[in-house]
Amino acid sequence: KTTSTYTVACQQLLNPIAGSDVSFKEEWWNEWEIRPYTLNAYIMCDPAHSRKKGSNRTAIAVVGIDANYNKFLLDGVCHRLSLSERWEALKMFRTKWKRAPGIREVKIGYERYGAQSDIEHFKEMMRIDGSSFPVYELNWTGGGGSQSKQDRIQRLEPDLKDGSFFFPFPTDEKRLTSHQKDYKIKKQEFLISKKILRKNEEGKVYDLVDWVKKNEYMLFPTIHPDFLDALSRIYDMDAMPPISRTRRSLEPDAEARY
């Protein structure tokens, strides 16, 4: 993997300032039209504990890992959520992706800072719902504050630069690409990328991927790069590629269209 510019600045140039203003380049933004059939899915939550305007947003990112360690943004949310809304969102994403064809494993990680009371609430809700699943605390040894968040996010750079991190293509269902049409004919529409449309705390619908690209990715380091921070937590999840359940697959995996 390529070493990040930030790491080079810190380790070789002995000058972290030289790398601190590094932004993510537009040409590093790669999109997927068709996801690989077999993936492990990781749900990472970076919670915000205020719904006040101008405060940080709760970011939940669902990232799939394929057999080659490529990473695919599959789903998510980025707006202000109450504790009960965070629980409902996590439960929804877990249920959705455990049921999705080809998904081998689903794990949930939750930002450790301030997480204990949240996780206690989740355990109580599981008891009430009659369900149980682990929520892993995501630790970070680099301290706190905005600089720490920037350091975490910088870990995305090598994968972005190498072309191994992919965002959903903004599919228009009325104008499918030729590759997507092939999968529709094969009745595998579930592998086709879709816009991730969410409704924020004000009831307004937003396109998650478009919002993240314009407000976080292209402006990094920005004031509130909440979703990028959640994405970077994939490196704290001990994420592993999926292991085939059979020695010889009866049907070959779909090739991802990048």
Where are these regions (language model features)?
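An active-site-proximal beta-strand-loop segment
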Residues: 45-58
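Mg2+-dependent endonuclease catalytic cores in nucleic-acid-processing enzymes, primarily RNase H-like
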Residues: 15, 19-21, 59, 66-215, ...
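Acidic two-metal-ion nuclease catalytic site recognized across multiple nuclease folds
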Residues: 233-258
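A residue-level signal for conserved active-site and pocket-lining positions in enzyme catalytic cores
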Residues: 12, 156, 230
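ATPase catalytic-site recognition across NTP-hydrolyzing enzymes
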Residues: 1-47
